[in-house]
């Protein structure tokens, strides 16, 4: 089926003709082919050069030396005061200094795509989302940009996206074949799910052992976004999932208000998908438990993590129990979920900011009431392991102090400058 860029975009919106459409740079409309990471980067830099709504940065490189780019998207006024916005947000995490002025504080939405490289609708949707944010005109987009700072991470897994796009595009027929036994759907091992070292990056938000994760975590703590989205795919016979997940499988450390706010924004997802006639479900199939995943890590940091799962076309079109599932359709659903996230974040901006502030006040109060006031780390057996642990803790902004004198506890001697103290307050 032929489609145009309009297939993905809201109706009755005009666009700045000076902002290049994806097809002008990529050579195809999103969904006709799978975007490779090099083309994705090329388009994002082209957008940033053409638009005064976008700032782009490279936060490092993958093992295969692909850039880990991040787009900051907002109004010109907000972009000019990003450092000020960051400082005000950091104040909210200090229970002694948290009387912030919410009237002038935008909500921060971190939108991340395709941490599993062979779940490509997310990264391809990021292209459409970026174009809309850069080119749309009118009061609606102006209001959106004034009230939000969008951190757009178009590819959580550049090496995996590149690997999968190469396979799928190389095996695409001129006339797309939806037969599930077609070669296009049998990606060779190790596949695009993982990074260069075949590690599942959606398990690394806590261990932070890999460059992709380290860049993400640095961005997270620099901004501490109110919402972080994690766009995935699932089996081809499925429809579309958005959180909350299974209520009984939510981590007990996650506040109930977190799940209530997740459900509030879920109403916006439902409305958006209803408007285009797409099927969806929630509160089933997926948990919200392990904090080392992209959709749950924010939940223990005063943010709202949201998982999206789109039934995958795997290639360009695939026969399923529900009929032929085409790649552009999967992209469209991810785009709609991106729009609805932003719309919901604006509608509940003050609630998200209040929750963010109150979360850190609650954590501080809990620490004061706790019987354990400090932890002793290291000082014996394996100093190298101690240093490795300290590196992880430092990346998570956990304050550690070296012992200034020897301490003996439970028959063990913890030596000065070889052991460390982690205070709970």
Give the ranges of each region predicted by the language model.
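Intrinsic-disorder/low-complexity accessory segments
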Residues: 1-120, 124-151, 197, 203-204, ...
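Active-site-proximal loop/turn and secondary-structure-junction residues that shape catalytic pockets
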Residues: 156-158, 233-235, 312
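Aromatic- and acidic-residue-enriched segments that line the glycan-binding/catalytic groove
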Residues: 162-178
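Aromatic- and acidic-residue-enriched carbohydrate-binding clefts of CAZyme catalytic domains
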Residues: 180-199
